[in-house]
Swiss-Prot record:
Protein name from the UniProt record: Protein RecA
Family statement drawn from the similarity comment of this UniProt entry: Belongs to the RecA family.
Gene3D superfamilies membership: P-loop containing nucleotide triphosphate hydrolases
Biased composition (Polar residues): 1-13, 362-377
Function: Can catalyze the hydrolysis of ATP in the presence of single-stranded DNA, the ATP-dependent uptake of single-stranded DNA by duplex DNA, and the ATP-dependent hybridization of homologous single-stranded DNAs. It interacts with LexA causing its activation and leading to its autocatalytic cleavage.
SUPFAM superfamilies: P-loop containing nucleoside triphosphate hydrolases, RecA protein, C-terminal domain
Keywords of the record: ATP-binding, Cytoplasm, DNA damage, DNA recombination, DNA repair, DNA-binding, Nucleotide-binding, SOS response
The keyword DNA damage appears for this protein: yes
Localization annotation: Cytoplasm
InterPro entries: AAA+_ATPase, DNA_recomb/repair_RecA, DNA_recomb/repair_RecA_CS, P-loop_NTPase, RecA-like_C, RecA-like_N, RecA_ATP-bd, RecA_C_sf
Superkingdom classification of source: Bacteria
GO terms of molecular function: ATP binding; ATP hydrolysis activity; ATP-dependent DNA damage sensor activity; damaged DNA binding; single-stranded DNA binding
Name of the coding gene: recA
């Protein structure tokens, strides 16, 4: 019985091999035909792709980098939205500075006509080499964005903001004229046009957006972003940034505490939350982010108001400890290295975890409330 079955199995395997060989040959022919018609790289096996892992751009905040899985993904569309004065433009200026530090080229499409070059320079932006456009209409702005992307010479384009991309029909019309859905149609057409070019050029495009309230919403969240739904679908990452606290020394306000929720992420787990300080005139407090992570990973320990490192007290209160880190760059580098090692080993902190951690809760409870005036901030 077993001897009779062997030739049958051999015949079946031969037929399968022959059929798979024919399929492979047909596949090679059709792939070759597609590449001749549409160019090299128009179709490929995913395993043959030169870049399997998505490269990232640092946001300037270590906690937000963790929440995003490394930073802003390159070659993708990103939307940053939130209320006024919540830190949207500051986030993008830090991204521009990071791109320029690495030898890249960045462009800022200033549809709001509100870019402050002095503030941008204080955040590390090379304003002399930053490409800036202040378009008159939404069509002009998006056409400029498309041409910059097509050039493959620009690494990052920031559009500030979608709400300010006014359609030509609205500008040329009379005040009070209704052009229902004009901006949404404009954004929908633009996203269809530029998305394919973004993938080919590797350019990252960050759209800043404002919030509006839906009329007649009794239950649920009445907030929505401007420009229709196209950007929501095409964006690989959507960040919701909010101002949750005003930082004070005595009665003097010197910054804000911002909370960013990753509302959408196609390249890493979404719905993570990151918090960081934004200092007026200075931007994101990188040392503040480092101290928060050092506290959560127990590289720096805290008892009451005192922070200690290797058993030695280094500062009373958060502000004094940040000042100590500024004044001791060698110790700061060692602490940063230890924090990154712990995070690489898989340590969970509030920015890379979906569940609230005890250290994060302790940290939140120790911060002054909005109405509270603190001598240490």
């Amino acid at each position: 019985m077993s001897n009779e079955g062997k030739p049958l199995q051999s015949t079946e395997s031969t037929k399968i091999d022959a059929k798979s060989g024919e399929k492979e040959k047909a596949l090679s022919l059709v792939v070759g035909q597609i590449e001749r018609n549409f160019g090299k790289g128009s179709i490929m096996r995913l395993g043959d792709a030169s870049k399997m892992r998505v490269e990232t751009i640092s946001t300037g905040a270590l906690t937000l980098d963790l929440a995003l899985g490394g930073g802003y993904p390159k070659g993708r569309v990103i939307e940053v939205y939130g209320p006024e004065s919540s830190g949207k433009t500051t986030l993008t200026l830090h991204a521009i500075a990071e791109i320029q530090r690495n030898g890249g080229v960045a462009a800022f499409v200033d549809a709001e006509h509100a870019l402050d070059p002095v503030y941008a320079a204080s955040l590390g932006v090379d304003v002399e080499n930053l490409l800036v456009s202040q378009p008159d209409t939404g069509e002009m702005a998006l056409e400029i964005v498309d041409q910059l992307i097509r050039s493959a010479a620009v690494d990052l384009v920031v559009v500030d903001s979608v709400a300010a991309l006014t359609p030509r029909s609205e500008i040329e019309g009379e005040m009070g004229d209704h052009s229902v859905g004009a901006q949404a149609r404009l954004m929908s057409q633009a996203m269809r046009k530029i998305t394919g070019n973004i993938g080919k050029s590797g350019c990252t495009v960050i759209f800043l957006n404002q919030l509006r309230l839906k009329i007649g919403i009794t239950y649920g969240n009445p907030e929505t972003t401007t420009g229709g739904n196209a950007l929501k679908f095409y964006a690989s990452v959507r960040l919701d940034i909010r101002r949750i606290q005003t930082l004070k020394r005595g009665t003097e306000e010197y910054g804000i505490r911002a909370k960013v929720k990753v509302a959408k992420n196609k390249v890493a787990p979404p719905f993570r939350i990151a918090e960081f300080d934004i200092l007026f005139g200075k931007g994101i407090s990188t040392l503040g982010c480092l101290l928060d992570l050092a506290d959560e990973t127990n590289v720096v320990t805290r008892k009451g108001a005192w922070y200690s490192y290797e058993g030695d007290n280094i500062g009373q209160g958060r502000d004094n400890t940040i000042t100590w880190l500024e004044q001791n760059p060698e110790s700061k580098e060692i602490i940063e290295k230890l924090v990154k090692e712990k995070l690489t080993e898989g340590s969970e902190v509030s920015a890379n975890s979906m569940r609230p951690l005890a250290s994060a809760a302790r940290q939140a409870s120790s911060r002054p409330k909005l109405s509270q005036v603190s001598a240490n901030g």
